[in-house]
Every structure is written in structure tokens, then in C-alpha cells.
Amino acid sequence: QCGRIWVCNGDSRLRSHRLSIIFGFARSYFMADTQYPAEVVAFLQELLPNKKQFELYMALGFYKHGKTEFYRNYKDHVEATNDLFALAPGIKGLVMTVFHLPSYGVVFKVIKDEFAESKKITREHVKDRYRLVKTSDRVGRMADTHEYVNFTFPLDRFDDELLTYLKETCAGSIEIRENKLIIKHLYIERRMTPLNLYLRDETDEEKIRHAIDELGLCIKQIALTNIFPGDMLHKNFGITKHGRVIFYDYDEICFMDERNFREIPKSDDPYALDTLSVAPNDVFPEQFEHFIVGKKHLKDCLKELHGDLMTPEYWRQLQAVCKEGKTINFTPYNPTKSFFYEPGKKKIAYL
């Protein structure tokens, strides 16, 4: 007999873009136990025609095969196109050199040989932070990364600016052999619109407000998985085509209990802060408003929607939740789409 799987699609209309988020690149893998992964992927592609095979294999937990499928897809795409690899849009990173192929939906990230003076970290520390994210619950808020060694590119597909910049910043990680450029170690992530560029170019106030709300939710949800994001400048976040804000800069992340959230001492002395004793793990949330977003109207919006982020008490409450080992369930979909939805019955908030 032929088995059938029924998907309820009533008056509320289940849409593919909402289903897509469940299998999204910012969520942890399902680790599906199936003898027929190819058939499962084929079924899911009928529901999600915009998802590539490698994305679905990875979402199901077949990570290594997903990497193989990605490389095949990448090679086929490069052979079928003629655009050039170029530096990715946005502010250049202090730790990574990031580039992309405009016609392809990923970015390539290479650890620089030397970091900016403000970054007191090592190459191994960066790798360790990326491994931490890989093994953590990403709750739909941290982009998945795919680590490759000796990844090959066609040399003639690099524009001059990118090739020069790679030689300047990542000489120890690249090798040129005849007509190929080999990168000894790199990470690949899904390409998103950097949040700072989105907020700069967007004119719709409602969309701007939604993005700022998403930014606050993103920070809070990551913290509830026992990870402190560290560098929370809005340039380190991206926004997807579905309007979700995702974090993608991991070199300064740490566990929540590794930080001491403090108040700024109240004083009439304008020089009091200059003499304040600060330990390396001290964090002052009251200062977050000065660097998460820059422009005043964006700061005001963030404080209105997520003002608790700027208080030490809130962060200490999150630390207590993490210490108790509580598991918080963040559904990636509106509760009205749940099979168990009962109108009028309060559910976990849609986050």
C-alpha cells in the first residue's frame, strides 16, 4: 500500500514561506531518523520549491551529505554563470574577509591573518566560537555556518579589488595554482541584507519598526539559550527576505555566566567614569543604546520596544533562567498555524 502524509491547510492557509522558516538556516538541525533521506527531501521540495537540496539535507541533520550537495550545487552554478566574486556589501569586518558571488545566495568568510588592535583574540578562538554556535540551539536567530578546507575557486572569476584585498588580509589562507585560487579554510553562510544597510535604505516606518523589534527579540532569544552575543552592533545582524533578524558575527560570543552585568555608578563628577575600575568580563547594559544602533530615532524605537535590554537587572534575570537550565520554546511560526491551536486559549508568545 502507498502511505500518505496529509498536511492540514484550512481557511488560515498554510503558505510555503511560513513552512520554510521551520527548515530555515538559522534553526538547529532536526536530526531525522530515516532510512530514506532522499525521499524525505524530495517530499519536502514539493512543499518548499525554493529550498535547495543541500539546505534540506542539512535541516534534517544530514550535515556531511548536505555539504557535498552544496559543493556540487556551487560548481554547477559557477559553470553556468559569468559574474565575478566581489567583496560583500557592508562594513568590512575586523576579523573576517567576506565576499560573495552576486548571483549566488551565500557569502564566503575567511579569517584574516591579523586582527584589528581592538580584537584581543586569536585565530583558534574564532574557530572555537564558530564551533560553539554549531553545537548550540540557534533558535532561529543565529546563522548556520559550513566549514570547508582547501575550497577551490576559478581565479579568473575574482574581481581585482577582492583579489588584492585577499592577498593583503588573508595571504596565509590562500594559495594560487595556475588558474585556481585555493582557500585553505573558510566558512560559508547564507547571504542576508546587513541590518545597517537595510535600516539606511528603508523608508517605510512600519518596516523599520518591525526590524528594530526583530533586533531586540533576536538578542533576547539568543541570550535565553545561554549565549551572550558580545558585539551587538547592528552591522553584525542581517535581515532575511521574510523579515527575520539573524545574528552572524560570532567571534565575541560567550556563555551568559561568563559576564558580570553591572550598573554605571551614579555621580555628579563628569570624570567619574574615567576612574571606574572595570574587569575584563564586566558589561554595562546602560551603554548598549549608544552602539547597538546609531541614529537617534532608531535608538528611541529600540528603547521603546526593548528598553529592558539596557538594564543590568534584565540581564541578571536571564542569567538566573539559564542557570536553572530552563528550556524556552520559541516557535518560528504564528501559534494560529499550530495543529494544536485552540482559538481563545493562550499559547506561548509568537517570537
Where are these predicted regions, by residue range?
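Active-site-adjacent segment of 2-oxoglutarate/Fe(II) JmjC oxygenases
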Residues: 130-147, 265-296
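Conserved kinase catalytic-core helix
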Residues: 204-235
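Long, compositionally biased intrinsically disordered regions
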Residues: 306-351
